[in-house]
Amino acid sequence: MRVNTDLVDLEYITTREELDALLLEIGGRPLLAMDYETYADVETWGPQASALDPHTLVARLLQINWPGNAIPYVVDLRALDWPTEIRDIWLDSSVRKVCFNARFEALVTQATWGVWPDNIYCAMVLFQQIGAATGFKAGRTRGYSYGSLVRDILDTPLNKELASSDWSGELTPAQLQYAALDVGAPRNSNYTSLLLEAYALLRNELLYTYEMPQVEDIDQAAFMEIARMEWNGLPINMNVMRSFLSTAQSELDNYKLRMSAHFDFSVDQVVDWNSGAPQVTLVVPDKITVLLNNPTALVSRIQKLLPVELDNLQQKTLETVLRELDSEDDEDGATSEEGIRDLGIQIISDLLRYKKLTKMVSTNWAALINPRTGNVHARYQTIGTSTGRMSSSSSGDTNKFNAQQISNVELMVNIEEDRLFEDN
């Protein structure tokens, strides 16, 4: 069905007859531009579902175009019950499929048909390779999005506001236009496919101007391996996780009691006689919790005890104060001013530990666990820095975590190697 929008004419494919006609057009073409639009399968996987998570998304649209074609195709995969003929295009090694973020397209293809695409090419990685090799992005508006690509390389701005719109319902002409422009081009431009034009231009630069064919091969192969890493995720031992949180909560309560002692707050005791021998439990007073949650009042209270300047409770500030206190030496080797310095060291050290424990306990760890796989899934970038180094990030998706920060997390429990790999 032909749809004429403000910026582009497109073919919207919703019937078997229309799909068959498209397949005839595609047959024998060696180069295609392809792109998905997805939505979160909230009905099946609940509020943790995400349109960016291959395990909990639904592929709604697939846009297709080829060189010289001014009327891109938008295939409604759901209306056609996700036809296997589309899967076969992804598997066809004789057809190069150019996608902007091919890692995501590979993941969606795996989620939809259970296969990994063959001969798929990532234009974003190509864009990043040029940026890393030349420093191009350092002097221009930063970013490697599709909008940045067509703006900076082809001088064609695109409105990307509908990227996060709801693709699960009846689609509007504006949504169809948005989808079509991911593989097409505005009718008043000099292009028919912005994606393919940018691909041809940048690849020529990479291969012939900068003579970097080996770099292209390595990074284009790498993004598929990264996609597999994202798909598989990391298994979680829930027994260890529960032990971790329980231990962290117990230590947090203990540090609240320590802070209560520093500020001379009275602590109640509860005696339990049910087990025969009396069991004494110390109860964290409410007023220490209130004080610890009031930074202004806490700063004021600490300043009354310590001979140092303190105007906030940021980690760097507290660490600086701690170093200052720790570096003060008395001539006679005794503690300064009746132990005030040592008290300050204890208070600041305990406060730093309390802040770490609070973050551990308050983090919604369950949100990181995929509701379908039971694993945690990081997001990786083949080229994540200006130097070309691989990176990990949780940006843009609350269901992902930053795998680069794992080594900076101070664990609260000692995990024996054999426990780490238990099945349960």
Each model region followed by its residue ranges:
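Conserved "right-hand" nucleotidyltransferase catalytic core of DNA-directed polymerases
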Residues: 2-9, 188-189, 196-424
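Conserved DEDDh/DEDDy metal-dependent 3′-5′ exonuclease domain
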Residues: 3-205, 245
